[in-house]
Every structure is written in structure tokens, then in C-alpha cells.
């Protein structure tokens, strides 16, 4: 009988070893899946920001050329935005652009992202006062401007304070 036992060698993995491997894979998946979901939401929101860049260009040109302010939703860029993730685009009288999000994730659908024209580092432009003087830049994603999207979903280029 002893001879029979000594000739049997272990081949393959034991049940305990397999269970440890399954547990490790489960832990890694629990960490990786939520991180990947956040990444995909940010990637899709980047498309929303790119869709708004047409309005940003149009409004910048109008500010530089001067003339009379066009008014809310009359900046001639609101209807040209084509994206499956943008439900609609609106502008206010000063050129602040807002996009309503759709088709991404229930946690961000129907939320709003804003782009705000600035005349200095932190001062929003006023069409009545700053027309013809050009713009300093744009602020993206600030809650003070109407963005109601959780900041962790915003692309890094759109986390304006």
C-alpha cells in the first residue's frame, strides 16, 4: 500500500487553491468595473464638450466683431450641435452655453454642462458691456454657472472652479 501512495503525485490544483484564485479575481473585478464605468462616462462627456465647441467658436467671433448682442438662444449655434449624447443646447443673453445630456448613464442623463465666456481669469463676460472687446477665455463645468453634473464625471479639461 505504501508503494502505491508514494507513486501518486499531485497533479493540478487543489480546491482551496482554485477558490483563492477566484476570490482574488473577484476583488480585482470589484475595483476595476466601477473605475471603467466612470472612464466610459467621462469619454462620452468629452463628446458633449466637443459638440459645444461650435458654439464657443461662434460666440467668441461675435464678441470680437462687436455689434449688438443677439440675445438668448439667438447666437446662431444652438441648432447645429449633433451628438447622440446632447439632448439640446441653449444660450443665455451673455453667451453662456448649456448642454443637456442624454443617452450616457442614468446618473448623468438630464444633467447640464455649461461653458461660460470670460473677460478675465474669473469674470464672466457681459454682452451688454463687453461686446467688441474680445474674450479672455472660457470656463467649463463650474457649478456657479449652472453645471449640475457630479465633478468626477467631468473631463479634466472641464473642471472649472
Regions found by a protein language model. Give the residues of each.
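Residue-level signature of catalytic and energy-coupling elements of molecular machines
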Residues: 26, 55, 158
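Alpha-helical hydrophobic helix detector
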Residues: 19-32
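A short tyrosine-centered beta-strand micro-motif
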Residues: 36-39
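Alpha-helical structural signal
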Residues: 16, 29, 45-46
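Membrane-proximal N-terminal amphipathic helix
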Residues: 41-67
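Periplasmic/extracellular, small/polar-rich flexible segments of pilin-like filament-forming proteins
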Residues: 63-161
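Internal alpha-helical transmembrane segments of multi-pass membrane proteins, especially GPCRs
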Residues: 16-20, 41
Amino acid at each position: 500500500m505504501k508503494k502505491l501512495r508514494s507513486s501518486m503525485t499531485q497533479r493540478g490544483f487543489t480546491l482551496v487553491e482554485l477558490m483563492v484564485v477566484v476570490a482574488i479575481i473577484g476583488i480585482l473585478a470589484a475595483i476595476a468595473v466601477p473605475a471603467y464605468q466612470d472612464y466610459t462616462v467621462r469619454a462620452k462627456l468629452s463628446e458633449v464638450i466637443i459638440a459645444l465647441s461650435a458654439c464657443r467658436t461662434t460666440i467668441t467671433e461675435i464678441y470680437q466683431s462687436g455689434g449688438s448682442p443677439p440675445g438668448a438662444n439667438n447666437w446662431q449655434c444652438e441648432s447645429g450641435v449633433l451628438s447622440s449624447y446632447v439632448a439640446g443646447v441653449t444660450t443665455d443673453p451673455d453667451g453662456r452655453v448649456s448642454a443637456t445630456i442624454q443617452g450616457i448613464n442614468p446618473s448623468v442623463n438630464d444633467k447640464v454642462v455649461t461653458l461660460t465666456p470670460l473677460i478675465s481669469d474669473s469674470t464672466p463676460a457681459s454682452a451688454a458691456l463687453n461686446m467688441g472687446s474680445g474674450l479672455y477665455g472660457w470656463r467649463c463645468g463650474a457649478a456657479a454657472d449652472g453645471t449640475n453634473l457630479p465633478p468626477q464625471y467631468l473631463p479634466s479639461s472641464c473642471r472649472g472652479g
